A protein has these predicted regions:
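N-terminal "pre-motor" subdomain/linker immediately upstream of P-loop NTPase catalytic cores
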Residues: 1-80, 88
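Conserved NTP-handling cores and scaffolds of large molecular machines
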Residues: 3-8, 38, 52-56, 71, ...
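Aromatic/hydrophobic pocket-lining residues that form π-stacking "cages" and hydrophobic walls in ligand
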Residues: 32, 92, 137, 162-163
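P-loop NTPase switch/communication element
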Residues: 65, 69, 75, 88-145, ...
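Structural motif
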Residues: 78-80, 107, 125, 152, ...
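Conserved glycine(s) of the Walker
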Residues: 84
């Protein structure tokens, strides 16, 4: 309970599971999934670096540098759980931040990497804290004058539809999809 906000505690009480991120001073940041099984508390944690690594540090193809600086479009990073989708997106946002001027708005559940403004103005919104749902945030994000929109994960058709519409209206949209192989993508 000490690591969770009152809203997260209520969500866990009501739904018996909750996702959130925590920072432990001197140790690091973690993405946490808290859940119940057979009446006991369980959790899974993943370490999140304090700063996003560069595309070069991740040894990702250099074409991603060009894609990250495009003026519009929809960029999907796909793969299985734990394959580096969020890390890759964070590196692309960092590349934009270092090499371009833009208004970037992220919608995440939870916020994982914390971005610091360099050349860009970056607003990071967390589902459940700063907005009710991905869909609600995406319906309103276009009024916030974004150049770049990052959607932490496309989980449903409403979010997918909103992502495509945002890209169609001239924005650069990044997101992730869980897939097991190329044909599923």
């Amino acid at each position: 309970e000490q690591l969770m906000t009152p809203k997260q505690v209520k969500q866990f009480t009501d739904e018996k599971e909750c996702d959130f991120a925590i920072g432990v001073p001197g140790i690091g940041r973690f993405r946490v999934n808290l859940y119940q099984q057979r009446g006991s508390l369980c959790f899974a944690m993943r370490a999140i670096p304090y700063t996003a690594r560069s595309l070069a540090e991740l040894e990702l193809p250099t074409v991603l540098e060009e894609i990250a600086l495009r003026p519009r479009g929809l960029v999907l990073i796909t793969g299985v759980t734990g394959s580096g989708k969020s890390t890759s997106l964070a590196a692309m946002i960092q590349h934009i931040n270092e090499n371009h001027k833009a208004n970037i708005i992220t919608i995440e559940d939870p916020i994982e990497f914390l971005h610091r403004d360099i050349n860009c103005h970056i607003n990071q919104r967390e589902v459940g804290t700063d907005t009710a749902t991905f869909g609600q945030a995406l319906r309103r994000v276009l009024r916030q004058d974004p150049d770049v929109i990052l959607i932490g994960e496309i989980r449903d058709l409403e979010t997918l539809d909103a992502a495509v519409k945002a890209a169609d209206t001239g924005h650069l949209v990044f997101s992730t999809l869980h897939t097991t192989d190329a044909t599923q993508t």
